[in-house]
């Protein structure tokens, strides 16, 4: 008798190729990003400077998101993804020769993020075309886990690689960038083996590419604004991205000040628990859905994020006692693990609801629209919160974020979670 049954999604060769490409591309992308953040943190000790780098990564979504989605829906997705892979490989290599110049690093970040704007919706829109509806939720869980997990994995391996080749301030800073370029090559080769994707093309008016592009974009805006089963999942995914952005720019300083650890230690102390939390979240998701349903599980997860922010803000008070630092480190590890579980509950379910309730002809545009909204919503709050943490109080900032999140969830919970989110419709 077979003890372990291989999930059907892992028998889908087309999905495995796309998944493998995503893994190598995302790990390389995040490995570069975290290496730059470490360099900036080492040179400046300023969350505000790090926030400027984060803004350079998010702003291209607003600029290119207007055209990325329509283009994804109108052209060969495989060809488009191969071109983007090639461009990213060159940009990752350029990081290795940029030194510590903030201006050059921001320019490369802007260009790499601009290219990625075409890759992300292409991948997301391709999944429903190569995976049956019966296993679509499995594909989304694995794909989104890789998207989130690659952030953590990139962060985990960045510090040890830098230390292995000499540490910050030495030539070891180049090693992660060179490795990222190698990852892109592997991802490119994998993607080349993907069969031609038969996409359902949208109807477009006659005229220039600009006329077609903006027609399709505004058609998508109409769908999002009129369909709450599309708009609310988008809000949930924006919430996840916003919190990832905030933590990425302020948590390094939190580790340095209150956990009293070197910046390179954050990978093992916090990122490992986070990735185990992501794995646990994926493993438990079906049981959580069965017991609590979509609405209640998402509601509780968002509330949990707010509580974790509040706890992180209060923890530094323990530093006054002899065992305070040990307790802060312990609770921070637990918080990282729980955060991984909560992110999976919100993001995987939000993504599944979004795909199942949006028109297949709009998949590329819907996820591109999500990128645009993330670009509009996240940079200003991240910059303001980073500035507040830098100039006023880092613990106080976490407390404020926690109270704010909890308040919004309690006030708006019945209005949104009770009336909109339900089981996805076919």
Give, region by region, the residue ranges found by the protein language model.
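Helix-loop junctions on the cytosolic side of multi-pass membrane transporters
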Residues: 125, 129, 173, 177-209, ...
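Helix-loop-helix hairpin linking two adjacent transmembrane segments in secondary transporters
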Residues: 143, 147-192
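Juxtamembrane intracellular "pre-TM" segments in multi-pass secondary transporters
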Residues: 1-16, 197-235, 258
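Cytoplasmic helix-loop-helix junction between adjacent transmembrane helices
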Residues: 109-149
């Amino acid at each position: 008798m077979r003890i372990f049954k291989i999930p059907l999604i892992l028998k889908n060769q087309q999905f495995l190729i796309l998944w493998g490409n995503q893994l190598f591309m995302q790990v390389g992308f995040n490995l570069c990003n975290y290496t730059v953040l470490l360099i900036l943190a080492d040179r400046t000790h300023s969350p505000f400077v790090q926030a400027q780098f984060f803004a350079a990564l998010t702003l291209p979504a607003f600029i290119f998101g207007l055209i990325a989605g329509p283009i994804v829906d109108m052209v060969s997705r495989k060809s488009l993804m191969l071109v983007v892979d090639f461009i990213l490989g060159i940009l990752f290599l350029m990081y290795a020769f940029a030194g510590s110049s903030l201006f050059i690093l921001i320019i490369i970040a802007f260009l790499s993020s601009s290219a990625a704007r075409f890759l992300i919706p292409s991948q997301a829109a391709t999944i429903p075309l190569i995976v049956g509806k019966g296993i679509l939720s499995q594909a989304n869980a694995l794909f989104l886990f890789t998207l989130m997990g690659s952030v953590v994995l990139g962060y985990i391996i960045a510090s040890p690689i830098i230390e292995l080749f000499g540490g910050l301030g030495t030539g070891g800073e180049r090693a992660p960038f060179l490795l990222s370029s190698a990852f892109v090559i592997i991802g490119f080769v994998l993607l080349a083996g993907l069969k031609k994707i038969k996409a359902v093309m949208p109807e477009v008016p006659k005229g220039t590419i600009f006329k077609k592009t903006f027609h399709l974009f505004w058609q998508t805006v109409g769908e999002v604004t009129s369909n709450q089963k599309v708009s609310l999942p988008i809000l949930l995914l924006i919430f996840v991205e916003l919190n990832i952005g905030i933590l990425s720019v302020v948590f390094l300083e939190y580790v340095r000040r209150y956990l009293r650890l070197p910046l390179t230690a954050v990978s093992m102390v916090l990122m490992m628990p986070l990735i185990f939390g992501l794995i646990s979240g994926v493993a438990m998701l079906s049981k959580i859905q069965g017991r609590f349903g979509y609405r209640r599980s998402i509601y509780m997860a968002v509330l949990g994020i707010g509580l974790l922010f509040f706890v992180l803000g209060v923890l530094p008070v323990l530093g006054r006692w002899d065992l305070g630092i040990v307790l802060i480190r312990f609770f921070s590890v637990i918080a990282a693990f729980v955060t991984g579980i909560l992110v999976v509950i919100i993001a995987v379910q939000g993504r599944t609801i979004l795909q199942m309730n949006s028109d297949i002809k709009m998949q590329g545009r819907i996820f591109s629209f999500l990128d645009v909204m993330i670009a509009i919503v996240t940079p200003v709050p991240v910059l303001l919160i980073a500035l507040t943490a830098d100039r006023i109080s880092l613990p106080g900032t976490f407390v404020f974020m926690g109270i704010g999140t909890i308040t919004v969830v309690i006030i708006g919970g019945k209005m949104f979670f009770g009336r909109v989110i339900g089981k996805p419709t076919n």
